[in-house]
């Protein structure tokens, strides 16, 4: 199968919106068993985001990862445009990638669902055990990597 370019939007506007590295890593493990992938990691310089980035870069997937944290927005936009799919916390990158026409799986852990499903290019994933999501859901540890993987396969098929 051809290589797929995946944007991982690790950035989040606050600690309750940043899905832990483990969830991204578990998803990466699932997807690389079925597809040849390149991962583009979108983070800010915030210390918590850098920790998540370093945790991902210390895995066996590091050679397939490209960190975007030293690039300007002008340099990042064409990279996003060349991704086949994007998996982002509810953050600037989920809005940018869906706005650029990229199918975007939005990890909704702590904000109203509307923020992550207003575009036909957005596919929200909500925490396990919830029927919807809002400002105090605090579900970042309950985002299920299997559901992300299932959604990716549905989009790509």
Model-assigned labels for residue ranges:
Residues 6-8, 39:
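Conserved hydrophobic helix-helix packing surfaces used for dimerization/oligomerization
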Residues 9-10, 89:
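Short, well-ordered coil/turn residues at beta-beta hairpins
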Residues 10-12, 129:
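Short, histidine-centered active-site or binding-site loop motifs used for metal coordination
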Residues 13-20:
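A short, glycine/small-residue-rich beta-strand->loop->alpha-helix junction that serves as a flexible
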Residues 23-110:
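Donor-binding and catalytic core of enzymes assembling or modifying cell-surface/extracellular glycoconjugates
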Residues 95-156:
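Nucleotide-sugar donor-binding patch of glycosyltransferase catalytic domains
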């Amino acid at each position: 199968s051809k290589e797929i370019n995946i944007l991982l939007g690790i950035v989040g506007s606050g600690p309750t919106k940043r899905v832990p590295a483990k969830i991204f890593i578990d998803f990466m493990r699932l997807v690389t068993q079925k597809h040849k992938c390149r991962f583009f990691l979108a983070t800010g310089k915030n210390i918590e985001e850098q920790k998540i980035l370093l945790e991902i870069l210390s895995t066996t997937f590091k050679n397939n990862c490209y960190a975007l944290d030293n690039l300007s927005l002008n340099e990042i936009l064409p990279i996003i445009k060349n991704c086949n799919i994007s998996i982002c916390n509810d953050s600037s990158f989920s809005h940018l990638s869906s706005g650029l026409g990229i199918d975007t799986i939005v990890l909704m852990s702590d904000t109203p669902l509307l923020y992550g499903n207003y575009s036909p290019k957005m596919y929200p994933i909500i925490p396990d055990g919830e029927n919807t999501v809002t400002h105090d859901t605090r579900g970042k540890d309950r985002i299920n990597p299997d559901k992300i993987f299932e959604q990716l396969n549905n989009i790509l098929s």
